[in-house]
From Swiss-Prot:
PANTHER family assigned to the protein according to its UniProt record, in alphabetical order: INNER MEMBRANE-SPANNING PROTEIN YCIB, INTRACELLULAR SEPTATION PROTEIN A-RELATED
Protein origin, superkingdom: Bacteria
NCBIfam families referenced in this protein's UniProt entry, alphabetically: ispZ, PRK00259.1-3
Keywords of this entry: Cell inner membrane, Cell membrane, Membrane, Transmembrane, Transmembrane helix
Protein name: Inner membrane-spanning protein YciB
Main location: membrane
GO CC terms, sorted: plasma membrane
Membrane-spanning intervals of the chain: 23-43, 50-70, 74-94, 119-139, 150-170
Family label: Belongs to the YciB family.
């Protein structure tokens, strides 16, 4: 459910762009959706986690710059910056001795610390790759970027989740 919730502003961005072919209008819809979503999550849980705050700041800054300056490149940079912030956060917390990935999902999944370390490095590499892929697409194939953002990056994430699931399946306890 969280994955679908996280995709809400992306879906609305895509739908708006598909209907209007206007990146500025799509950025405005994504900005409003991001702020409303963050407000709702804050109201419901009385807090936002670190990456939700980062996502909110980035949509306000990059979406706002896109709208105010009338330049779609700002909104196109947002996913790259978000992916790289995520990679930096995970790597930094891991190197500082507190595994951010374990802190965020460790209650649901019990793994040895060495596996949490490997999983963190997998995520760091994947997030760096995703940032580079987004940058590559929007700088080389600007007209196709919206489709890549909706379908390409989502497919890559699902593929990564499957690979991660296969990797983790060897460590998860089997129920009798």
């Amino acid at each position: 459910m969280k994955f679908v919730s996280d995709l809400l502003s992306v879906i609305l961005f895509f739908a708006t762009y598909t209907v209007t072919k206007n990146m500025i209008a799509a950025a405005a819809v994504a900005l409003v959706a991001g702020v409303v979503q963050a407000a709702f999550l804050y109201w419901k849980h009385k807090r936002l986690d670190t990456m939700q705050w980062v996502g909110l700041v980035l949509i306000v800054v990059f979406g706002g710059a896109t709208i105010v300056l009338g330049d779609s490149r700002f909104i196109m940079w947002k996913p790259t910056v978000l992916f790289w912030c995520g990679a930096l956060f995970l790597l930094g917390s891991h190197l500082a001795g507190k595994n951010g990935l374990k802190a965020s999902i460790g209650r649901e999944i019990q793994l040895p610390d060495a596996v949490w370390g490997k999983l963190t490095y997998m995520w760091v590499g994947f997030l760096i790759f995703m940032g580079i892929a987004n940058w590559f697409v929007f700088t080389r194939f600007e007209a196709q970027w919206v489709n890549y953002k909706m379908f390409g990056s989502t497919a890559l994430m699902l593929f990564f989740f499957i690979i991660q699931g296969i990797y983790l399946s060897t460590y998860l306890k089997k129920e009798d």
